[in-house]
Amino acid sequence: MSELGLFINPKDGGKPIELTKDNYPLTFITKITTHPRYPNRDQRNKSVNVPGLSRYNVVIIPSALCHFLAYGSVQMVRVGSYWTSGDTFHCYYDEFGGPDGWLPGSDGESHFFLYGTLKDNPPDTYGLFLNAGASAAIDNFRSITQENEVAYCVYRKKIYIDVNNNRGYWSLPNDIPNRSSALVFLRPESTSQVLRYDRPNNRIISWGAGWVYVVVFSYGLNLQPADGLTIWNKQGKVVFNSDYIPFFNNGHTIKMSGNVATSSFEKPMFSMDMPNTWLENERVNVNCYLSGFRVENNKLIANRMWTIDFYPSYANYMYNQVVYSSSYCIDFNDYF
């Protein structure tokens, strides 16, 4: 344990955490949804202005980066890269996309959740500042102040998903604020269980029954004064308390290659948001399967689930039985 920091023992009774100059909370900035058709169908580079974005060191958590459509032949539309510059978020599509013709499991929309840490705090900022020692200069972006919109761990449990009684579905609890923008991280106990997060319906879908570790982060909680640390803004609203563990910076993004992605954590939890439709060429048709992931140690492995439809065409071999996806990872040992 460090001698410098804030020790949080949350009210959910789960594993505590220590916030330090190296482990510090991330502020929710915004959620961005993009589509290859809009606002300009002839531009692959899409940009969204986010006022004040340049004030942050930004962490981008992606969802649903790849979609398939068909106009006679099957086409892939994928976000190949994404980044921020100043007050602007950018993403670049590998191909152009049409207004319709999307194969089952695709709608063309990709989602990006932007979190960050302030580069500098305003002169009148107050709160908790984490730095290297009492004599060190304040490291401004490692802080919890009245300027932050901190996301919190609002749910962390080991749950059982039953395919017999609940058809393999598990919905997020209704009392989670901003459910459609919540970050959901999963780790199944069995290496054979296949999971995906169905964001439009705020639920986990499982191929096979089993125990799953779930951690959910969200923002917009109606915070009340806590017995530990409480920070109010100038309007008298509580903007931080130590009843909950905040979403903090100990995470990283991985990208699928050959249907496998590997985390640097020994025992990671993964976001499994909306992987693309799994396509399989079968005679004159391409079968469309729902896709998901299973977990082996620190590896995330793409798998097909069940058939959702077919299309009378043939998919390019590059699209056949392949998931193009990215995942954000957190360390299981930070939460359980």
Positions of PLM-derived features:
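Extracellular receptor-binding modules and their adjoining Ser/Thr/Gly/Asp/Asn-rich linkers
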Residues: 1-56, 65, 80-173, 199, ...
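N-terminal accessory interaction module
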Residues: 48, 285-294
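Short secondary-structure transition "cap/hinge" sites
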Residues: 141-149, 183-187, 194
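Hydrophobic alpha-helical segments, especially N-terminal targeting/anchoring helices
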Residues: 232, 294-295
